[in-house]
Every structure is written in structure tokens, then in C-alpha cells.
């Protein structure tokens, strides 16, 4: 990827980075382990972002 990134692309990458984190511990405690992990966890090597 180029060193210079357009602002729109940089904002989309930042949003993808923020959405790629585990759920808080209190969520699984409050739902009594019905919710165990986020459904959209992404690894940089396994699955790539589309249209960014």
C-alpha cells in the first residue's frame, strides 16, 4: 500500500481497525456467555478488506 493515503481511505482503515477488537468482558458476563466473541473479527493475513 502506498505511503500517502487519501483521507477517505485512511478513515475507512481506521474504522476497520476499531471494529476489529474483542467484545468487553462485561458483555459476556451480563449475557451469561450467550455472546462469546465478536462476529466480525478479522486477521490481516487471513482475510482482506474489500473496496478500501
UniProtKB/Swiss-Prot annotation:
Q: Which UniProt keywords apply?
A: Ribonucleoprotein, Ribosomal protein
Assigned protein family: Belongs to the eukaryotic ribosomal protein eL39 family.
Membrane-crossing residue ranges in chain numbering = none
Q: Which Gene3D superfamilies match?
A: Ribosomal protein L39e
Which biological process terms from the Gene Ontology are attached to this UniProt entry? translation
Q: Which InterPro entries match?
A: Ribosomal_eL39 (IPR000077), Ribosomal_eL39_dom_sf (IPR023626)
One annotated GO molecular function: structural constituent of ribosome
Q: Which Gene Ontology cellular component terms are annotated?
A: ribonucleoprotein complex; ribosome
Q: What is this protein called?
A: Large ribosomal subunit protein eL39
Protein origin, superkingdom:
Archaea
Q: Which gene encodes it?
A: rpl39e
Pfam families (alphabetical)? Ribosomal_L39
UniProt keyword Ribonucleoprotein, yes or no: yes
